[in-house]
Amino acid sequence: MQQLSLLDSVVIPDTAQLRAAELRRLLEHHNRCYYELDSPEISDAEYDALFRELQVIEAARPDLLTPDSPTLRVGGKPLARFSQVRHRMPMLSLENAMQEDEIRGFEQRIRSLLALPDTVALQYQCEPKMDGLAVELVYQDGLLVQASTRGDGEVGEEVTANIRTVRNVPLRLTGDNLPALLEVRGEVYLPLAAFQQLNQQREEAGEPPFANPRNAAAGSIRQLDPAVVARRPLAMVCYGVGVMETEARTQTELMSQLAAWGLPVSDQARQVSGIEGAIACFQDLQERRDSLLYEIDGMVIKVDDLRLQQELGEKSRSPRWAIACKFPPRQATTRINEIILSVGRTGVITPVASLEPVELSGVTVSRATLHNWDEIRRKDIRVGDRVIVERAGDVIPAVVKVLLDKRSGTEQELPEPETCPVCGSRAAREAGEVAVRCQGGLACPPQLAESIIHFASRDAMDIDGLGSKYIEQLISLGLVKDIADLYRLTRDDFMQFERMGDKLAENLLAAIASSKQQELSRFIFALGIRHVGERTARTLAERFGSIDNLQTATLEELTSIRDVGPAVAISIRSFFDAPANQTVLQRLKAAGVAPTVEEKRVGGRLAGLTFVFTGTLATLGRDEAKKLVEAEGGNVTGSVSKKTDYVVAGSEAGSKLEKARNLGITVLSEDAFSKLLATGGNQ
């Protein structure tokens, strides 16, 4: 008699479909019991048996694999790169409070803005400030369809495949009254025990350990291979929403609603009355900090009433209704064995203390920044000193104090360098700066290497595969002396490397060639202009539309742009005025490097005007409408404030329309918006 295989026993269509649905339900239920409720109902072996059964069914019947299947949590195929995602509403950062008086000042500002007398008690929601990576999840009709990192607050990276591997993130929401669209924000983190285990595994494998749990979480989520992420026991906690229609009246009710839908929220969140109640909650959390199973670096205080949150609104980078109360940095005592001089991409020579290793926040610290020579003189830091070090923000170790009473008299001062420790070029300060810089420019190997590494990096020209190892070899072989030389490389150049095959050389050349058509904002950022980060580069690209226009921009034109102050404008102008840089740009153009951008008109019809869109537009998508405004020099934001000039209301407009009317802001129909685009308001 022929023996039936396991596949044969589960391919009956109706039975297989019903069983797969039941297995998905059971696995998600047990996932939640284990990861959220900490109350497992079955053994690991029983869970694995259910999981394997579902895998077998899906292998036999691929048509039964659903987007919310728990089997997707093991990770899929590696990605070539992350795509960018623009958040519908900006993911703002929070203002910080380091002292209790600053926390009280937070309430005073709120009372002033709301014209609230002291007799009216404000309610707050207090929650731990997780030390992880901020992400946004998008659910449509209850199904997880997209996940992205915070990025710069406006644009992040899509990490959906990686987030699906985070065990306490529901792939499908449960419960009643699920919204058609839900954007939920939260923090992905690595529990402390898992962090220590991961670092032990990395050290055993000869890999460098992560500096802290936050870096481990961020590095994991930005892994291109979801299978690697799936092997790391990440977790997530939700703290707020972006786009969502809600009947909740308070932040506390909103978090309860998210929990009812199966989303993980903090079990440490508290609702308190008055700012003194919030301060007491902060003090209590600080005392209990070391007993928690995860790293936190403070507490977030939020006005609990959602209506008041809406009324308070946001500043350009942070909401007015929330503040992050930071814990004092943890400290330890150690000895400075040596002071090492490090040369960075822009030539800054930074003194770094080599320390006797000391344990700090669960991490072994052996180096600490000394910042600059003004700081060294101010603190009277010498080689051989006993010092107090702290992890500022619990991330970057720094020397904060010298224990003068521990001096023996043998300690040695470190003079300010007059020459570069690497290339020997003259080192000097520039007017108004504390930094000492090597004047060797690209003749200085660290500056050359770092400038090319930056140029090729993922956030800049994104030349896939061209990492620091290959760049250093290119420089040592004399094949690359500036960024333009990258576009002259040949297959034979790469074949000089050890263990370089034909296929890898072809891939590197293809990656370099494809970067010739990179976005203008990335190209501007890649040039490494001092003070020009990704956000400013994007603003410059939108404003000028081409590198030629930016090259010829005057100081007056530059300083008129948001995000560009006098120091940034001078830095931009100095960069483009330098003959060496002009030569490099000419060579890049000759090599076919032609950055692309949808041109944004300088002094366009809508220049200086700020728009907010709400509801559904009949003839335009939201992104298309945004591009039209920006192409005419206008700005689009996600929230209504007194600085908003126009609110464009489509069908099913929400609370933004009501707020606009309350503030007396002009509300436009879609037709009126189209006419404004055509005329710029000049009838």
From Swiss-Prot:
GO BP term, example: DNA replication
Keyword Manganese among record annotations: yes
EC number annotated for this UniProt entry: 6.5.1.2
Protein family: Belongs to the NAD-dependent DNA ligase family. LigA subfamily.
Active site annotation, chain numbering: K129
Cofactor: Mg(2+); Mn(2+)
Reaction catalysed by this enzyme: NAD(+) + (deoxyribonucleotide)n-3'-hydroxyl + 5'-phospho-(deoxyribonucleotide)m = (deoxyribonucleotide)n+m + AMP + beta-nicotinamide D-nucleotide
Domain of life of the native organism: Bacteria
Domain BRCT: 601-683
Residues the entry annotates as binding NAD(+): D44, A45, E46, Y47, D48, S93, L94, E127, R150, E187, K302, K326
Protein's recorded name: DNA ligase
Function, in words: DNA ligase that catalyzes the formation of phosphodiester linkages between 5'-phosphoryl and 3'-hydroxyl groups in double-stranded DNA using NAD as a coenzyme and as the energy source for the reaction. It is essential for DNA replication and repair of damaged DNA.
MF annotations from Gene Ontology: DNA binding; DNA ligase (NAD+) activity; metal ion binding
InterPro entries according to UniProt: BRCT_dom (IPR001357), BRCT_dom_sf (IPR036420), DisA/LigA_HHH (IPR041663), DNA_ligase (IPR001679), DNA_ligase_AS (IPR018239), DNA_ligase_CS (IPR033136), DNAligase_adenylation (IPR013839), DNAligase_N (IPR013840)
Amino acids binding Zn(2+): C420, C423, C438, C444
Keywords: DNA damage, DNA repair, DNA replication, Ligase, Magnesium, Manganese, Metal-binding, NAD, Zinc
Gene it is expressed from: ligA
